[in-house]
Amino acid sequence: MKIVLANPRGFCAGVDRAISIVERALELYEAPIYVRHEVVHNRFVVEGLKQRGAIFVEELHEVPDDNIVIFSAHGVSQAVRKEAKERALTVFDATCPLVTKVHMEVARASKKNIEVVLIGHAGHPEVEGTMGQYASDSAGMYLVETPDDVIKLNVKDPSNLHYVSQTTLSVDETADVIDELRRVFPDIQGPRKDDICYATQNRQDAVRDMASQVDVMIVVGSKNSSNSNRLRELSEKLGTTSYLIDCPEDLKEEWLTDQAKVGVTAGASAPEELVNQIIEQVKAFGGTAVEELTGREENMFFEVPKELQIKTVS
């Protein structure tokens, strides 16, 4: 049984930056360091940071006074920022810069009293943070997930409308929603550049290229990872039986029985160390040669905050 590796796969620049922020804060300021929400949606990463002294909370009231708090890569609402400022908490912001770009689009529209439609999944922390950038009382912001949601949308002024999207969605499904928005609201405006992040796009393209070459697809990622779920869904849509797994123990031997080729990819929050562990498990179930496909080269890099760039405390 041949193992075929997607390329690119795994960590993106935003995830790298977010994890580095927590690691450097622990190095410079020592434990405990509080993190609002899982810094990235990967159980392996979160457990590793917990062992080093990071404490993950869902709300700021769980952070004691006079402590450091890190905002996760998914971003937070303006209300959360205001609360942190009022409590004089020391904040390091691990929000992905590509999410921040969407936040700025929403904030600009809000100041101009332009209504905004966000394409995204209800309940996802990125969506909650993005919705929380809108402050206009005279206009409104709306969340849609499917073309059917667009049909039901009742906006105040169809001629004064802008759309943005969650950064980790399915490229194809988002395009379908945008097409419906433009059909129903011909005057709607959108971002100059697609909000779907480069890493989400590249990993979906890699799965698209690989799905027809393998008999079964293993996607490495946590159940709460939006971009990992989209990879599994895309592979299934392309006709390849696919599974999302969090760790080597999740892999079932019967999935690989009588399969000639197994594809392996990973969501943007899954580390290569975990991918390697899962490859070893595939080998234990009969995997032999490993082939890594060629793919789009990624050289994106995001700096950590300057306060965390020093190596030692002076």
Swiss-Prot record:
Query: Record keywords: Iron-sulfur included?
Result: yes
Named cofactor requirement(s): [4Fe-4S] cluster
Q: Which residues bind (2E)-4-hydroxy-3-methylbut-2-enyl diphosphate?
A: H41, H74, H124, T167, S225, S226, N227, S269
Q: Where does isopentenyl diphosphate bind?
A: H41, H74, H124, S225, S226, N227, S269
Sites where the protein binds [4Fe-4S] cluster: C12, C96, C197
One of the GO BP terms on file: isopentenyl diphosphate biosynthetic process, methylerythritol 4-phosphate pathway
What reaction does this enzyme carry out catalytically?
A: isopentenyl diphosphate + 2 oxidized [2Fe-2S]-[ferredoxin] + H2O = (2E)-4-hydroxy-3-methylbut-2-enyl diphosphate + 2 reduced [2Fe-2S]-[ferredoxin] + 2 H(+); dimethylallyl diphosphate + 2 oxidized [2Fe-2S]-[ferredoxin] + H2O = (2E)-4-hydroxy-3-methylbut-2-enyl diphosphate + 2 reduced [2Fe-2S]-[ferredoxin] + 2 H(+)
Write out the pathway annotation from the protein's UniProt entry.
Answer: Isoprenoid biosynthesis; dimethylallyl diphosphate biosynthesis; dimethylallyl diphosphate from (2E)-4-hydroxy-3-methylbutenyl diphosphate: step 1/1; Isoprenoid biosynthesis; isopentenyl diphosphate biosynthesis via DXP pathway; isopentenyl diphosphate from 1-deoxy-D-xylulose 5-phosphate: step 6/6
E.C. numbers: 1.17.7.4
Residues annotated as binding dimethylallyl diphosphate are: H41, H74, H124, S225, S226, N227, S269
Catalytic-site annotation from UniProt: E126 (proton donor)
Q: What is this protein called?
A: 4-hydroxy-3-methylbut-2-enyl diphosphate reductase
Gene name of the encoded protein: ispH
